[in-house]
């Protein structure tokens, strides 16, 4: 039997599988039982609105009501955003993973332990902060020297420059996300100012 919410439950299942999350993990996050989630995904039970919202939020999704005439524009925005960010994030994660493996083998090449720790922390953050295409190019250029390090290991000065470039990218990504999140006005007016 096909339910009216079938297309929504199919999208929720696809989102769960894309995040490589098991039904058990989704159950723990959403507060629904695993059998309930299984029945919803198989289509043997029509979920209530509350259950749909719980599952969607556990998957970092939101259920939104939008005017039907805006749906083509919304679909285009979602498709273009997911296509570009998935490719960049995949490339970025591969590069960060490669650098983390390199770092595990060559940690002693850094001038100081604090510089090595900063480099490691920067990589850990860059695994989760999306970079623009231009920033990814800079990231690739800054770390390209490490790919050739087996035959010709980089000097401490080169490692210091690479660590500085990676830290700069990390800082740019962190501050961009923070600045985009909270719009601030150019002027602050204090309503309780008695000097007026």
Curated annotation (Swiss-Prot):
<keyword id="KW-0805">Transcription regulation</keyword>
<dbReference type="GO" id="GO:0003700">
    <property type="term" value="F:DNA-binding transcription factor activity"/>
</dbReference>
<dbReference type="InterPro" id="IPR010982">
    <property type="entry name" value="Lambda_DNA-bd_dom_sf"/>
</dbReference>
<feature type="domain" description="HTH cro/C1-type">
    <location>
        <begin position="12"/>
        <end position="66"/>
    </location>
</feature>
<keyword id="KW-0238">DNA-binding</keyword>
<dbReference type="InterPro" id="IPR001387">
    <property type="entry name" value="Cro/C1-type_HTH"/>
</dbReference>
<dbReference type="GO" id="GO:0005829">
    <property type="term" value="C:cytosol"/>
</dbReference>
<keyword id="KW-0804">Transcription</keyword>
<protein>
    <recommendedName>
        <fullName>Uncharacterized HTH-type transcriptional regulator y4dL</fullName>
    </recommendedName>
</protein>
<feature type="region of interest" description="Disordered">
    <location>
        <begin position="174"/>
        <end position="196"/>
    </location>
</feature>
<dbReference type="InterPro" id="IPR050807">
    <property type="entry name" value="Bact_TransReg_Diox"/>
</dbReference>
<keyword id="KW-0614">Plasmid</keyword>
<dbReference type="Pfam" id="PF01381">
    <property type="entry name" value="HTH_3"/>
</dbReference>
<dbReference type="GO" id="GO:0003677">
    <property type="term" value="F:DNA binding"/>
</dbReference>
<feature type="DNA-binding region" description="H-T-H motif">
    <location>
        <begin position="23"/>
        <end position="42"/>
    </location>
</feature>
């Amino acid at each position: 039997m096909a339910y009216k919410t079938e297309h929504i439950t199919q999208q929720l299942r696809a989102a769960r599988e894309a995040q490589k999350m098991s039904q058990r993990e989704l159950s723990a996050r959403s507060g629904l039982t695993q059998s309930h989630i299984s029945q919803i995904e198989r289509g043997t039970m029509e979920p209530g609105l509350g259950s749909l919202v719980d599952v969607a939020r556990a998957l970092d999704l939101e259920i939104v009501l939008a005017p039907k005439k805006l749906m083509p524009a919304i679909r285009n925005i979602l498709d273009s955003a997911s296509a570009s960010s998935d490719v960049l994030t995949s490339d970025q994660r591969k590069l960060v993973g490669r650098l983390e493996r390199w770092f595990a083998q060559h940690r002693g090449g850094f001038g100081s332990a604090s510089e090595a720790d900063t480099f490691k922390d920067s990589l850990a953050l860059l695994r989760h902060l999306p970079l623009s295409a231009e920033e990814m190019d800079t990231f690739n250029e800054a770390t390209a020297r490490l790919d050739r390090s087996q035959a010709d290991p980089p000097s401490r000065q080169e490692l210091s420059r690479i660590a500085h470039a990676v830290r700069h990218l990390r800082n740019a990504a962190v501050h961009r996300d923070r600045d985009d999140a909270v719009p601030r006005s150019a002027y602050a007016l204090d309503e309780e100012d008695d000097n007026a």
